[in-house]
């Protein structure tokens, strides 16, 4: 019997995270989350689902094929330089997924299915005027995705952000 954990104060984001936590537990993958309160309130449910399901699908597939089997999802609000929502996903990865030109190489068996997840992520990032960077760390065999959403460019931003994580 699986008990849902409360990892987010947003019910949809909590459900998405719990789906992947359950899948990871079943496959021996360590998944850690640190999701601060009210960090994704500006995003529609459709966009939140598209963004986080695609990010976590990609991370899950890569971690499953790696020898360390790790995923980490962090979402926080920071005011270090300006008001920003920072989404970071880090996962173990068996090999560098970029070709020599910096393009992602698909590991999917069907080439027809390649790229839709990344395009969906890029669509959401662009819609909310964010920036995304992805890189592979050869030394640690980890893939990193960093997404920044800037308060100044997000419609319907709520100012009630907290620096505290939810109790797990």
Language-model region placement:
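Glycine-rich/acidic phosphate-handling loop/turn and adjacent ATP-lid/helix
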Residues: 82-119, 152, 156-167
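Glycine-rich nucleotide-binding loop
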Residues: 95, 137-146
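Glycine-rich ATP-binding loops of the HATPase_c
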Residues: 126-137
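Conserved short strand/loop->alpha-helix "switch" segment adjacent to the catalytic nucleotide/phosphoryl-transfer site
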Residues: 5-9, 31-51
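Short beta-to-alpha transition helix within the HATPase_c
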Residues: 9-27
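Short beta-strand/loop element within the Bergerat-fold HATPase_c
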Residues: 70-82
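Short beta-strand patches within cytosolic ATPase/nucleotide-binding catalytic cores
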Residues: 32, 74, 133-135
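Conserved ATP-binding N-box helix of the HATPase_c
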Residues: 45-69, 124-127
């Amino acid at each position: 019997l699986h008990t849902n954990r409360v990892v987010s104060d947003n019910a949809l984001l909590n459900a998405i995270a719990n789906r992947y936590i359950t899948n990871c537990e079943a496959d021996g993958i360590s998944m850690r989350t640190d999701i601060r309160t009210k960090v994704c309130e500006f995003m529609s449910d459709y966009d939140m689902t598209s963004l986080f399901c695609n990010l976590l699908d990609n991370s899950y597939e890569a971690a499953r094929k790696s020898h360390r089997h790790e995923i980490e999802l962090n979402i926080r609000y920071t005011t270090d330089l300006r008001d920003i929502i920072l989404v970071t996903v880090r996962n173990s990865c068996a090999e560098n997924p970029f070709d020599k030109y910096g393009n992602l190489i698909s590991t999917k068996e069907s080439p027809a299915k390649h790229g839709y997840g990344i395009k969906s992520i890029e669509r959401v990032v662009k819609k909310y005027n964010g920036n995304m960077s992805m890189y592979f760390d050869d030394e640690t065999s980890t893939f990193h995705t960093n997404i920044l959403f800037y308060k100044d460019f997000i419609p319907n931003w709520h100012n009630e952000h907290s620096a505290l994580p939810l109790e797990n």
